[in-house]
Amino acid sequence: MSLAVVTDSAACLTEPLLRERAIEVVPLHAIAADNGEPATTSRPSVQELVDAYRRAAGRAEEVLAIHISSALSGTIDNARIAAAQLEAEYRTQPNGPGPSVGRRRPQWLRVVDSGTSSGALGLAVLAASGAHDARRGAALAQASTARSCQLFVVDDLGRLARSGRIDRTTARLDGVLGIRPVLALTRDGIRTLETVRGAARARRDLIAQAVRVAGG
């Protein structure tokens, strides 16, 4: 059994690693505004995902797609649509590209919501890339994310508020009082662990939270 892994650019993996592990990457798009507003991001299109999954299927019997958390992006929604389209296409074209296409096992193409992003997503993808089938790869990815915890502070809460990732009241407190929350990415979205005044205090508390989570 052979496995090809697909992810998106939120995994932040380097080109040498991608080449070494033969990992297919679909880019998330950054959209620059002309009026001076901050850049925004856009999920990959269904067609971009179909094309990536098809390339992966051309060199492996099973495909595992591991994507950025659905709490941060709609990528996983398009990924599931793309997977359904490609599976339907292969059912009607048994002699299509890829090893033993006509004899592919059920669930030969699996889509996994990682529940995370950036480095934690990258580690999950790397863990999965060592597996020989999609089921084992998904289990390794999920075990990796279960061991990870993403904590962070940001300089401008307005961007998170405009995208709906935090509430606007929290963002206004930052602007008026200099309140900075220490944030955590969970499967349900971005959660505030604590709020402090000032960026320096927020960074100190972030380090303290990280040490606590790590068992230090």
Predicted segments, located by residue:
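Flexible, charged surface loops at secondary-structure boundaries
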Residues: M1, A57-R59, R212-G216
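N-terminal glycine-rich anion-binding loop in soluble enzyme alpha/beta folds
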Residues: S2-A57
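Structural beta-sheet core signal
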Residues: V5-T7, A65, V111
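Mixed-charge interfacial surface used for oligomerization/domain docking
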Residues: A10-L18, L28-I31, G36, T75, ...
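Short glycine/serine/threonine/alanine-rich loop segments
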Residues: I23, E61, I179
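Short gly/ser-rich anion-binding loops that grip negatively charged ligand groups
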Residues: A39-R43, A65-I76, S114-S118
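N-terminal glycine-rich phosphate/adenylate-binding segment common to multiple enzyme folds
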Residues: E48-Y90
